[in-house]
């Protein structure tokens, strides 16, 4: 799993 700024909003 990659850490993306977009995913940071969800997680």
From Swiss-Prot:
Similarity remark: Belongs to the NPY family.
GO cellular component: extracellular region
Chief location category: secreted
Alphabetical keyword list: Amidation, Neuropeptide, Secreted
Compartmental location: Secreted
UniProt-listed GO biological process terms: neuropeptide signaling pathway
Protein name: Short neuropeptide F-1
Modified residues (Phenylalanine amide): 11
Tissue expression per record: In larvae, both sNPF-1 and sNPF-1(4-11) are expressed in the CNS and ring gland but not the midgut or thoracic perisympathetic organs (tPSO) and abdominal perisympathetic organs (aPSO) (at protein level). In adults, both sNPF-1 and sNPF-1(4-11) are expressed in brain, cardiaca, corpora allata and thoracic-abdominal ganglion (at protein level).
Naturally occurring in which organism (per UniProt): Delia radicum (Cabbage root fly)
